Structure formats: C-alpha cells, structure tokens
Regions:
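Rhodanese-like catalytic fold shared by cysteine-dependent sulfurtransferases
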Residues: 1-17, 24-54, 63-118
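Short, surface-exposed ligand- or partner-binding patches at beta-edge/loop junctions that are enriched
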Residues: 58-59
C-alpha cells in the first residue's frame, strides 16, 4: 500500500509513525521531520508494538519501502510506503513553499497598491 506526500500531510500526528529506512549518509542530507531512523531489517524483524498507529515507511524513491510495507501489512499492521519516497516528499514540500511564498507576494502587492488589510 502507498500513501502520497499530500495524504501524509493531512494525517493527524498521533495516528501514525514515519520510519526512514535510508542510510545514515542519505539521512544526513535531510529527512522528514519527526521520522524515526531504522533499517529495513530492524523494522521488519522488530515491528512496533502499537498496532493502532499507521506505519509510514520511506526510502529514497519509494522502491524498497513498498516491499517492507507489504510484509508488515501481511503481519496485520496498517503500513504504507511513501509514494515516490523522500524525493517525492521534498518536491511536495518545495511546491507548497513556492505556493505559500507566491501568496505572500501577491498579498503584499495588494496591500501596497490598495493600502488595505487582507
């Protein structure tokens, strides 16, 4: 099962845990805030005790994490692979920042031009 970056952002914090199965080197370049670093073997062999929380797993491109998510689903967990992996999450975050920055620029322009509060 897969989940998109947009769907992940819509989940409530307490209902899931995000696991980063990339290498330490990859993680040093960036990671999803709040994610737990682990290895694929560790996650598969010692899954979380709390079966009520969704498990979101990501790797660099979403290729390796989907296999782990499938195997955890077979064990009765609600596990998802982040579609497109960390790179897709980064693209989503960058797009949202650009949209937010654009909105701020438009708002500033309107305030300046019309001298009104929005």
């Amino acid at each position: 099962m897969e989940i998109s970056a947009e769907q992940l952002k819509k989940l409530n914090n307490g209902e899931y845990t995000v696991y980063d199965i990339r290498s330490e080197t990859d993680r040093a370049y960036g990671f999803i805030p709040g994610s737990v670093h682990t290895t694929a073997d560790e996650l598969e062999n010692n899954p979380p005790a709390d079966r009520d929380k969704k498990i979101i797993i990501y790797c660099a491109h979403g290729v390796f994490s989907i296999d782990i998510a499938d195997r955890l689903c077979e064990q009765g967990y609600e596990a998802y692979s982040l579609e497109g992996g960390y790179l897709a999450w980064m693209r989503y975050e960058m797009q949202n920042r650009q949209d937010s920055e654009l909105c701020q620029k438009v708002e500033q322009s309107l305030r300046k031009k019309f001298r009104v509060s929005i």
